Structures are given as structure tokens and as C-alpha cells.
Amino acid sequence: MPQDAPAGLAPGFLVAAPALADPNFNGSLVLMAEHHAQGALGFVVNRPGPITVADVLGGLDAGLRERAEGAGRADDPVLVGGPVQPERLWILFRPGPAAPEEGAVALGAGLALGGSRELLEALVRARDPGPYLLLLGYAGWAPLQVEREVGEGAWVPLPLQGDLVFDVPMEKRWETAVRRLGLDPAGFLVGGGGAEA
């Protein structure tokens, strides 16, 4: 049965229904950063890509790569944030005393988002920057597209919860989100759809 799409999906999460066949989003948990009349923007937060933090930092500055290695972050995967602009780097982080806030947007629930080289360098150089994720690309929806997909049951909205991003292992994020919806992942079945590729 279709459900009514909420008026404001951001900040929050979209949990992909198992029937969502689009390979870009099957089994995904999407952090919604923007949702307005012009469309929506979000980031898949549970899909590792083929490159690491060291790969990204090494292309910018060898010193940054060494700093990430020293902090034990060099082998962390860079996530596939979505199929739109897959070359564009985004940084999702937990603001804190050592984490810079300039060039970032607070999303709520202890999460902030930015995309500047300066922000990335400041996080890597900080003594204790707190957790952060690097993402390449994003998920984008045309006006009313995400509302239609939610109404068709392709996605189920979940309120923003910062711990889903930084305290739950990546491979458990979708399952944990489904459980927080009060559903059993094994029996969670609803309709189709998919964001823009």
C-alpha cells in the first residue's frame, strides 16, 4: 500500500526497500542533506568504493596521506555517495573541538557536511578531529521525484540519528535502520523506484 511522502525528508535518512532494484541504491541507507521544491540531495552512507582515504589524500598532498596513516585512517574506504558527479568529494563528519566548522553545514544529530579541500586538510591535520567519512558523488532527485518514490514504497523515511553513521559498522547500517523502523529486515518488502543516476 503506498504511503504519504512526508513534506520534509532532510535532514534524515531514506532506507531502501528490498524491492528497490536500482543497483545504485539496492540495500542502501541514504543520508538526506537537502529536500526542497527544486529537488533533493542525499548520500549513500553504507557503500564502500574501490579507493581509500590514502588514495584521495595522496593525490592532494603526501603529507596528508602520511598524517592519515599515522592516525590509522589511511585504509578507510571512500564511500560511493551516489551516482551523480562521482568525481566530487564530500566530507561527512562529527563536529567537535578539534573539527573545523568553516566551510561546513550542520545537519543536526551531531553531523556536518562539507566539500572543500580546506575542510578536508583541516580535519586530517587536526590532532583529534573525531570521526569522518569521505564520499564520492551524491544521490539527486528531481522536483517531486523523491516524494513519489517514498509514496510508492521504494524508500522509508527515518529521522536523523548521528550514531547510524559513526557508531554502527558500515555493513550493518541498513539492517540497523530497518530495525529502528520497527521492521524485520527479512520480512521488509515494499515497492520499486530509484534516484537519478
Curated annotation (Swiss-Prot):
GO (cellular component) term, any one: cytosol
Superkingdom in the source lineage: Bacteria
Entry's family note: Belongs to the UPF0301 (AlgH) family.
Record protein name field: UPF0301 protein A2cp1_4106
Species assigned in the record: Anaeromyxobacter dehalogenans (strain 2CP-1 / ATCC BAA-258)
